[in-house]
């Protein structure tokens, strides 16, 4: 009810009556009167007036932004730290989290081009992934290309991760052994499988839960992808993979625009446990990749503890070479992508690139030291 009053054009009288009636229909006793009183109080002022009241005594600029954009303060501060020298963009970033994102489709490589998919769906081609198509709205599940498995629903940033993994330069021939160490629920595995098929490669997928393993198997049906249920920290695989993707479990702070309620379900204390897991998965990947092979580490979070800190620690190893992702990450038209920062890792942003805030870094095994 408060959302309708403050964020939509529904009339105050209609919004109040609707939710009072809902309380009565649910047989909530006197709750209907309480709902009526609260919503009528909310309706007295618009959103800006309520925000002004909430931050009347708050002087810290980041805290004021957090209140005004409905973000926990710890998340706003983490984003400001991640932006670094570009921290002046924080208002745009937080506003992007509160805006409705476009629907992103991925044309399946080898089956349909982004140009064809855009013509069929009425969408527009993306600028970062050569397979991306954007739609302003709609239910993609009802679209023929999606139903026919010619396209999938996938944020363009996630597509870029898979593309980067397939393009990263190896030392020596690509023997066609690719590994997706955290494959569930299967979005990137589908893209990797299609890219692998075009390169004559195969993908091994690892997922810790049987349920998510089944999801990946269903999603990648017909592709050269074989999925196993195992713990990615010690999956029991023979080393020697040419390419390994670690799409690490993370806080998901980069996808708050798609799951706005998630910001209130997470705490700063959650991060450290995730970092321990992320480091262990990356260590496992570096054991499994062959000398000259590449590990692509990615998170859907811009939090520095989950991104740069993890990579810097791994890069201290004598057998690891940190690659500049920007050098093999060109846009859909083959030109360099703007706004990727100073490297060697890449951080995408919703307010800059129109994607979730995906982070990616590439590490190449140099030898067996």
Place the predicted regions along the sequence by residue:
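S-adenosylmethionine
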Residues: 1-369
């Amino acid at each position: 009810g408060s959302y309708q009053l403050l964020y939509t054009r529904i009339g105050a009288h209609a919004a109040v009556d609707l939710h009072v009636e809902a309380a009565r229909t649910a047989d909530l006793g006197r709750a209907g009167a309480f709902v009526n009183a609260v919503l009528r109080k909310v309706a007295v002022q618009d959103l800006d007036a309520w925000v002004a009241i909430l931050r009347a005594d708050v002087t810290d600029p980041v805290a004021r932004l957090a209140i005004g954009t409905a973000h926990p303060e710890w998340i706003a501060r983490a984003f400001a730290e991640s932006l670094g020298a570009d921290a002046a963009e924080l208002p745009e970033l937080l506003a992007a989290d509160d805006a409705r994102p476009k629907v992103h489709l991925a044309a399946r490589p080898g089956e349909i081009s982004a140009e064809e998919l855009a013509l069929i769906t009425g969408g527009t081609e993306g600028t970062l992934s050569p397979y991306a198509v954007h739609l302003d709205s709609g239910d993609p599940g009802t679209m023929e290309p999606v139903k026919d498995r010619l396209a999938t629903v996938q944020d363009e940033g996630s597509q870029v991760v898979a593309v980067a993994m397939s393009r990263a330069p190896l030392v020596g021939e690509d023997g066609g052994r690719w590994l997706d160490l955290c494959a569930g629920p299967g979005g990137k595995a589908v893209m990797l499988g299609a890219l692998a098929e075009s390169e004559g490669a195969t993908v091994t997928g690892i997922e810790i839960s049987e349920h998510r393993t089944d999801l990946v198997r269903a999603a990648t049906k017909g592709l050269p992808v074989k999925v196993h249920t195992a713990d990615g920290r010690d999956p029991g695989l023979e080393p020697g993979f040419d390419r390994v993707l670690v799409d690490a479990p993370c806080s998901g702070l980069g996808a708050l625009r798609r799951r706005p309620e998630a910001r209130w379900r997470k705490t700063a204390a959650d991060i450290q446990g995730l970092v321990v897991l992320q480091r262990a998965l990356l260590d496992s990947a570096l054991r499994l990749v062959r000398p000259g092979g590449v590990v692509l580490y990615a998170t859907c979070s811009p939090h520095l503890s989950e991104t740069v800190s993890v990579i810097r620690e791994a890069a201290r190893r004598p057998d690891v070479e940190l690659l500049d992702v920007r050098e093999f990450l060109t846009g859909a038209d083959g030109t360099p992508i703007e706004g990727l920062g100073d490297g060697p890792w890449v951080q995408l942003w919703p307010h800059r690139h129109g994607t979730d805030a995906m982070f990616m870094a590439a590490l190449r095994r140099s030898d067996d030291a």
